[in-house]
Each structure stands twice: as structure tokens, then as C-alpha cells.
């Protein structure tokens, strides 16, 4: 995260901050917000991690390359998904390709091959995605439509929670994949 943060600061012309991270203990989410005025650090408890339920968002995915606090598309997606009884929503591009969820990177299994939406869709090059690429071998990047995800085993990831299986997509049960458990176990060194 630190490397991505510093690279984004360089590209966006923001002075690199000196970060002193809190020491709240294990299972904490630490958030650094950096602006031209300085940096703020916050932390919160991780909470329980369980399989997630996803729905498709009506909000279109707008490409971005840096993790910034302007997250309107993701906030609207997450709010609508939770109102619908799901944990998160999947955003589609204007061309109808699945991009990512509001707080998760998305992957699907095609046999023993792990696939992910291409970074070229303008999704964040997530730290968790890089870790999964180390563990699963190179991810196969594929453009996929919502219909093409039906019946596939799905997983999501983020740096706070690691690898998490998807239990339901649009209210339909998602099949499990044995390789998911191996990724979950190996994600945290």
C-alpha cells in the first residue's frame, strides 16, 4: 500500500507524507488519507469475515487509476446493494463488462484457472490482486459480461479481508471451488 500511495502522490503532485501508523493490534483496518494539506491516519476493527453476496449495480463504472477519496460511484453502489440485502454491488462499464465491486476486486474460476477483469478497464491495481497473482500464478485477464458470470465460482479480495468466496450473485447460489480455500490460507504470510 505504501508504494502505491507514494506513487500516486508523485503522479498527482502531492508531497509525500511522513506516516506514523497506529498500533491498535491485529485485525485492524488502517486508512491513510493524503492531500496537499497533509495526512490523516485512522483505524477501525476489521469485523467478521464471511462469504459475500453480490448484486449488479445500476451505477456505471468510471475508470480511475489512483485510490482517491472521491468515491461517489462506489458509495452509491454499496448503499444500493445493502438496501437490496446484498453485501456489495458489481459495477459494469459502459460497454457492459464487469469491472469490480465497491470494496472488492472480483475474480472467477474457469476450471483451475483464475480470471479477473483487465486493469485496462480502468480499475484499481489493487494490492490484494497483486498478492493473488503471486499465489495463483498470473491472473488471466478477461472481459466478461454479467451473463457470462452465471454458474461460475466467484471470489473477491481486498487487502483488509484477504480472499473471500462469493456465496450468492443476484440471489442465486454460487458454486464453490476447492482452490479458493488454498488461496485463503496462503494470502496472509
What are these regions (language model features)?
Residues 97-104:
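Short beta-strand/strand-turn micro-motif
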Amino acid at each position: 500500500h505504501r508504494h502505491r500511495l507514494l506513487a500516486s502522490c508523485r503522479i498527482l503532485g502531492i508531497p509525500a507524507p511522513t506516516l506514523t501508523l497506529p498500533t491498535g493490534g491485529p485485525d485492524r483496518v488502517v486508512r491513510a488519507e493524503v492531500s496537499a494539506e497533509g495526512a490523516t491516519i485512522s483505524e477501525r476493527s476489521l469485523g467478521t469475515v464471511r462469504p459475500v453476496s453480490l448484486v449488479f449495480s445500476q451505477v456505471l463504472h468510471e475508470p480511475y487509476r489512483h485510490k482517491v477519496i472521491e468515491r461517489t460511484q462506489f458509495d452509491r453502489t454499496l448503499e444500493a446493494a445493502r438496501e437490496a440485502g446484498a453485501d456489495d454491488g458489481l459495477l459494469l462499464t459502459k460497454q457492459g463488462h464487469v469491472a469490480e465491486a465497491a470494496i472488492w476486486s472480483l475474480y472467477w474460476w474457469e476450471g483451475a484457472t483464475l480470471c479477473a477483469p483487465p486493469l485496462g478497464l480502468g480499475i484499481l491495481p489493487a494490492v490484494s490482486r497483486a498478492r493473488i497473482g503471486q499465489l495463483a500464478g498470473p491472473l488471466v485477464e478477461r472481459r466478461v459480461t454479467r451473463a457470462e458470470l452465471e454458474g461460475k465460482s466467484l471470489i473477491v479480495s481486498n487487502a483488509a479481508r484477504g480472499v473471500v468466496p462469493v456465496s450468492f450473485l443476484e440471489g442465486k447460489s454460487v458454486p464453490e471451488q476447492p482452490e479458493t480455500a488454498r488461496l485463503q490460507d496462503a494470502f496472509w504470510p
